[in-house]
Amino acid sequence: MEHQRELYQQRGYSEDLLPKTETQRNWKAFNYFTLWMGSVHNVPNYVMVGGFFILGLSTFNIMLAIIISALFIAAAMVMNGAAGSKYGVPFAMILRGSYGVRGALFPGLLRGGIAAIMWFGLQCYAGSLAFLILIGKIWPGFLTLGGDFKLLGLSLPGLITFLIFWIINVGIGFGGGKVLNKFTAILNPCIYIVFGGMAIWAISLVGIGPILDYLPSGVQKAEHSGFLFLVVINAVVAVWAAPAVSASDFTQNAHSFRAQALGQTLGLIVAYILFAVASVCIIAGASIHYGMDTWNVLDIVQRWDSLFASFFAVLVILMTTISTNATGNIIPAGYQIAALAPTKLNYKNGVMIASIISLLICPWKLMENQDSIYLFLDIIGGMFGPVIGVMLAHYFVVMRGKINLDELYTASGDYKYYDNGFNLTAFSVTLVAVILSLGGKFIPFMEPLSRVSWFVGVIVAFVAYALLKKRTGFENTGEKKLAG
């Protein structure tokens, strides 16, 4: 491995993109157990659960669907992170094996250069609003600072809280996995206290019976709920489409495959059991208690009389936003941008570039047209299911769980693998799978497929890629050598 690392360094690759050494791969199962809790318990996910009630599903079915979703999420994270844990290589480099050295730039740019940066900015802005609430409860006069002052539509208090929250997020991004691990170790018990406590509070207010019987006003119970049950599972799993694609950014640090597999599986299942119970109890209980349907946990917390309880709850919600932003956005963006120019940029350069762009796009302005922005990001996110399908089929079926690292760490200008650096089979399959999974957003008769888009994208891409490779044969010498 040391000889390979030296060779790849001579080819111009930065330390951040090289295969990790044995001493660097020190994440144990517990590190992965705590990694994703904050990404499960965040404001958008709770709002999403409120939307599930609109479908007319029973409270029990919603909870069951959420828990089952955890199994699919864990499978995607573990299996697509298998190559990373085996070879200690980040997602940006592993993607080259599936799409080609040049071909990997397109899906990689979508993941780390567009979706991650836009979501990073939007999450920073959303978190700054919660931060504004937090400061306003302690110092009400802060909310009127600057009077009518506006900078690009942002008030002075809004600008201050946004910049502070942005700096905190960037700092976590610079620290990478080491800082994130320490952060999540502190965050996890706080999540149990806050969201577990909120669930107990809701049950004590209205009782478990009314919560289990809850339906929003004007909504009738669904008669045939089988397909809707699958729609809920797809919605929960689809949130993880981007993190699952870039799972190797975290599994590259794993002590072993078993460590990341055991840690991620147990961590996600435990997190989602708590989330399933807490989200349903909090949303249903608060809606019944306040006499109006309310699905945003921040709106619920703002109604509390206890300053300490609301302060602590909002603080933990802010911490979950930071955790989500780090794992899902800024860390993958840092690696991917570094991979765009591996001889000139490193991970921290990538983080800084992504962070600055997230400022320049003025996320508070984007939120003024949030329906269009979310549709755009949904379409990009919908492409990640097919990408996962191709990556899984390539690694497990074509390569039989082996990687030719020389195929990934080629010298600058060396595109001998695939068709001038592009795996055309992978691109063709991805295009077809994207059309089938997202076509329903524009073509009415395909709408049912779009409601289960993640499953359609992954399954179609996996099967089609495996069959085409079996029929057409291998396209590069690395495939022939390792799979032959």
Named regions from a protein language model:
Residues 124, 128-137, 190-218, 239-240, ...:
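Hydrophobic alpha-helical segments and their helix-loop junctions in multi-pass secondary transporters
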Residues 125-128, 160-204, 264-268, 376-385:
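Membrane-interface loop-to-helix entry segments
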Residues 54-56, 81-83, 98, 106-108, ...:
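Membrane-water interface regions at transmembrane-helix termini and the short interhelical loops
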Residues 19, 23, 387-464, 471, ...:
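C-terminal membrane-solvent junction of multi-pass transporters and transport-like membrane proteins
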Residues 108-109, 135-175, 189-198, 228-247, ...:
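Transmembrane alpha-helical segments of multi-pass small-molecule transport proteins
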Residues 1-60, 196, 205-209, 219-231, ...:
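Membrane-interface "cap" regions at the ends of multi-pass membrane proteins
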Residues 27-46, 161-168, 199-206, 217-280, ...:
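Hydrophobic, membrane-embedded alpha-helices of multi-pass small-molecule transporters
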Residues 41-45, 68-76, 111-123, 189-204, ...:
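Selective recognition of specific alpha-helical transmembrane segments in multi-pass small-molecule
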